[in-house]
């Protein structure tokens, strides 16, 4: 397990540093927007705008976790497929399914660390400015966007691991349709009642990569 995690870390470490800086940058800028409004018109105006106009001030973050998840999957798995490393990896004296699961687990762990850092930054700042009901409104609104980032990572990993180009296209279409679910309702907290199911739905997408590996092992290649 440690060896697999180390191998994945070597491949992705510079991208992860960039992803962390970019996501924190966007989260920090969103907090500065709140600070600017609060400084110019008072905290009461921030509360009024949030309640009366359904504004959450963090709309810039909407597609950032999605892009981070997509790019992580590409950085992690495209070299494996391009250099034919996956075939060698799957012939190591180690359970194949467990190896792929560990590679995906690595990606999930580093994404969760990155996204948790975003949440920590936003929470620490907003606790000093907004009432708990208001900053929890923002945090719950952005949660589906971060779940979309995790789902995007798992779905693009599935596409990258697929050994045939025809299935690449089909898997891409399916992935776009599945990811669309995370962005159907633009209103703040629109997904609150659905969040547990959305989290389960996100984790279940990990099983799709097993289908690609089964096809790879069966010799399905272009």
Predicted regions and their residues:
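Secretory targeting signals
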Residues: 27, 31-38, 42, 46-69, ...
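Alpha-helical transmembrane segments of multi-pass membrane proteins
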Residues: 6, 10-18, 97-114
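Helix-loop-helix units of permease transmembrane domains in multi-pass membrane transporters
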Residues: 77-106
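Hydrophobic alpha-helical transmembrane segments
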Residues: 1-62, 75, 79-80, 161, ...
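Short, charge-rich amphipathic segments
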Residues: 22-23, 82-92, 132-139, 220
């Amino acid at each position: 397990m440690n060896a697999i995690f180390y191998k994945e870390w070597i491949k992705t470490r510079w991208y992860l540093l960039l992803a962390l800086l970019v996501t924190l940058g966007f989260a920090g800028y969103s907090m500065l927007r709140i600070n600017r409004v609060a400084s110019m018109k008072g905290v009461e105006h921030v509360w009024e705008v949030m309640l009366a106009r359904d504004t959450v001030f963090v709309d810039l973050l909407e597609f950032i976790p999605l892009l981070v998840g997509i790019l992580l999957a590409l950085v992690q798995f495209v070299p494996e497929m391009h250099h034919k490393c996956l075939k060698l990896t799957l012939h190591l004296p180690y359970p194949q399914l467990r190896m792929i699961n560990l590679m995906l687990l690595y990606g999930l762990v580093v994404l969760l660390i990155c996204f948790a850092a975003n949440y920590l930054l936003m929470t620490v700042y907003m606790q000093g400015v907004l009432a708990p009901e208001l900053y929890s409104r923002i945090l719950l609104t952005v949660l589906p966007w971060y779940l979309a980032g995790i789902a995007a990572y798992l779905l693009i990993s599935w596409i990258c691991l697929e050994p045939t180009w025809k299935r690449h296209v089909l898997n891409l279409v399916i992935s776009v349709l599945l990811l669309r679910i995370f962005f159907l309702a633009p209103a703040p907290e629109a997904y609150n009642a659905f969040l547990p199911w959305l989290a389960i739905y996100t984790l279940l997408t990990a099983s799709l990569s097993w289908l690609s590996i089964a096809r790879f092992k069966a010799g399905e290649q272009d």
